Amino acid sequence: MKNYKGYLIDLDGTMYLGTDEIDGAAQFIDYLNNHQIPHLYVTNNSTKTPEEVTQKLKEMNIDAKPEEVVTSALATANYISDEKSDATVYMLGGNGLRTALTEAGLTVKDDENVDYVAIGLDENVTYEKLAVATLAVRKGARFISTNPDVSIPKERGFLPGNGAITSVVSVSTGQAPQFIGKPEPVIMDIALDILKLDKSDVAMVGDLYDTDIMSGINVGVDTIHVQTGVTTYEELKEKDQQPTYSFKDLNVAISELEKNAQK
């Protein structure tokens, strides 16, 4: 395995599995920290703030800082702010998205007379919220969605994800949204801009082929698949585009890096 100068790292299925630690995850981050190798956590989760994400990582014995976290909510706020710094936004979503939008200097409104509609995972979604979002898009608001995941793994099983909620507005208006999160290039380009490294020196690490691995492939960075989450090695072998590497877990990645260091 190549020694990269920076890493973009997925969370659920890579750093932890729900509320369980994944063997090798904390050790991999310790290795990066000890060797002063920059890395960012890139997540499609829009409900949490970077501080909340960091707190969960610390509970998993992973040493992380809020400034190392790029959520789809942060990327969405960044994207809108770059297009129109004084934009008004109608949003569906949680505290993570609302905080990101307001901290970016954007105005969150509760009616359909807005510049943008931003949809993130909203566990308290109602018909009225979807109705206002639909009316706003029909009136010409730019239609943004934090991430396309149609289902999310929870303790009860796979539940509707943000892509499922977004599809209601999309089907009703006949308009496709601009998705921000993985596997779209938007969130990856923002993360790469923060790292300020050549793409050839960066690897994307993740478990889920359709989001994590494809996000790396879509922006032209190497990819490291870990067999600790959703996509199994057997499923991976059936894919047309293969990751650069696939490891049983991140302990194997550490061993590979240590071998290179001894050469």
Curated annotation (Swiss-Prot):
One of its GO terms (cellular component) is cytoplasm. The keyword Magnesium applies. Its cofactor is Mg(2+). InterPro entries: HAD-like_sf (IPR036412), HAD-SF_hydro_IIA (IPR006357), HAD-SF_hydro_IIA_hyp1 (IPR006354), HAD_sf (IPR023214). The keyword Hydrolase applies. Keywords: Hydrolase, Magnesium, Metal-binding. SUPFAM superfamilies: HAD-like. Its EC number is 3.1.3.-. One of its GO terms (molecular function) is phosphatase activity. Belongs to the HAD-like hydrolase superfamily. NagD family. Catalyzes the dephosphorylation of 2-6 carbon acid sugars in vitro. This is Acid sugar phosphatase. The lineage of its organism: Bacteria, Bacillati, Bacillota, Bacilli, Bacillales. The gene is nagD.
